[in-house]
């Protein structure tokens, strides 16, 4: 693949595995310099070693910690001098019915803080940098940010992400910043480590990463606002 983006910087949250890691690999192949944010420092540093320390920066960080995110973005700017694109991809799911079963207040709070507050904080902290570069803000939602998924607070957090993406797009009109909501269906990633798979067809993390790069590779005047990506045969 031709390296076309050697001067551009992409910051990815949730970068240590799954969609985030595959997006980092594909972006590196296109020549992006990478600032990679994740809680799992060991996996993050393994990925940086794989992709090359000259062009990739590990930023261990919990996106639910505002100050830690601010510091991570500052370090990325100090290292690379600019940020051209941000992929707010951090998020997870836990079994979360609203009725029946044991109470899980800590899990609920952690999920809302990561999926909603963390994503909003990523936007708030990075958008000033993207205005400078007329850059691109991408955020991971979900197919369940469009439909009602039973027994699932996670679905409610992704409805919130859908609203966040639309609000950011409206705010950034006239700034030159593009905004893209990536909405995967069922994807085979470590996401399913804590919840049962639905037993339907699956996409790979690479399928979603290709979609992210497709949106980023459009001409500056083309703003792909929403990409809903399901595997063929997924029933919902």
Regions found by a protein language model. Name each.
Residues 174-177, 181-182, 197-236:
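C-terminal helical subdomain
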Residues 93-109:
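Conserved mid-core segment of classical short-chain dehydrogenase/reductases
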Residues 142:
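Residue(s) in the substrate-gating loop at a strand-loop-helix junction
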Residues 16-17:
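Conserved glycine-rich cofactor-binding loop
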Residues 123, 157-158:
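Active-site helix of classical SDR
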Residues 30-47:
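Conserved glycine-rich Rossmann-like NAD(P)H-binding loop of the short-chain dehydrogenase/reductase
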Residues 41-42, 60-72, 105:
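The beta1-alpha1 cofactor-binding region of Rossmann-like NAD(H)/NADP(H)-dependent oxidoreductases
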């Amino acid at each position: 693949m031709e390296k076309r983006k050697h001067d551009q910087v992409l910051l990815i949250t949730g970068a240590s595995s799954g969609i985030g890691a595959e997006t980092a690999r594909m972006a590196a192949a296109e020549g992006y310099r990478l600032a990679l944010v994740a809680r799992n420092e060991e996996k993050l540093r393994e990925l940086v070693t794989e992709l090359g320390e000259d062009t990739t920066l590990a930023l261990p960080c919990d996106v639910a910690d505002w100050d830690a995110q601010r510091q991570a973005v500052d370090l990325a700017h100090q290292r690379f001098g600019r940020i051209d694109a941000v992929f707010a991809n951090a998020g997870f799911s836990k079994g979360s019915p609203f009725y029946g079963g044991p109470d899980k207040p800590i899990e609920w709070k952690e999920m809302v803080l990561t999926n909603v507050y963390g994503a909003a904080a990523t936007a708030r902290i990075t958008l000033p940098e993207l205005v400078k570069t007329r850059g691109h803000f991408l955020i991971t939602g979900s197919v369940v940010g469009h439909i009602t998924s039973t027994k699932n607070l996670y679905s409610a957090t992704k409805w919130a992400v859908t609203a966040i993406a639309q609000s950011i797009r409206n705010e950034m009109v006239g700034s030159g910043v593009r905004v893209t909501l990536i909405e995967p269906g069922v994807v085979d990633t470590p996401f399913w480590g804590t919840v049962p798979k639905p037993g339907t067809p699956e996409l790979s993390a690479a399928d979603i990463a290709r979609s992210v790069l497709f949106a980023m590779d459009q001409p500056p005047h083309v703003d792909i606002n929403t990409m809903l990506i399901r595997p063929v045969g997924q029933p919902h």
